[in-house]
Amino acid sequence: MPTYSTRARIALSLLAAAGLAAAALATSPIASAATNPAKYEKAQVGLTYTVYAPTTSIELKRSSFQLIDCGGGKDEQLIASFGSQMSNSGWINLNESQTGCLDGPDGVGLVTKFKVKGATATIKGSCKGQVSSCSKSNPARLRKGSGYTTVTLPAGSSALKSTFVEVYTAGMSVKDIKEFVSGLEPVQ
């Protein structure tokens, strides 16, 4: 059995405690309540952009819900996930902010555009051969790989601003993505 110094034992204890804390957070009601409208309504307080809550999760189990710092004096960004990137049943990651917090992914090309709440949503899918950029992709690559959808949805009231929405997906069809994005409703 190896002998550890006092510092090493303390470091190992802290790592173990951090792991237990992370596991507790992952199974907490906050993490598992992503489709609960009350979570979205509560998140709206203090934000200047309109928070949109999904009315469907395309039968994917909710997996997380959080507000994170967007930096640069911007409002916090809302992030909610459904399903798992590691499963074959699909994954959706919803990001809402006043403007994009991060650049979108590389290696995606246009699949289609559609209208939602008067705005144009753009669905992009994985590029053939996993190249860093392409002008077009197709629904089959979207379904087998990853997707990235963006739309700026209108303000829910005159007191709020419009919302930049990014939807990252894995293993989802164009129909699924359209259903999810079209089902986003402003909280009251």
In which residue ranges do the predicted regions lie?
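C-terminal region of N-terminal signal peptides and the immediate post-cleavage residues
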Residues: 1-6, 11, 20-43
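Charged/polar, solvent-exposed surface patches and flexible loops
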Residues: 10, 45, 179-183
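Hydrophobic alpha-helical membrane segments, chiefly transmembrane helices and signal peptide h-regions
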Residues: 13-28, 146-154
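A generic alpha-helix preference that emphasizes hydrophobic side chains
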Residues: 17, 30, 57-58, 181
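A broad, low-specificity signal marking well-ordered, structured residues that form hydrophobic/aromatic
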Residues: 31, 80, 165
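Short, solvent-exposed recognition patches
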Residues: 35-161
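Surface-exposed amphipathic alpha-helical segments
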Residues: 161-188
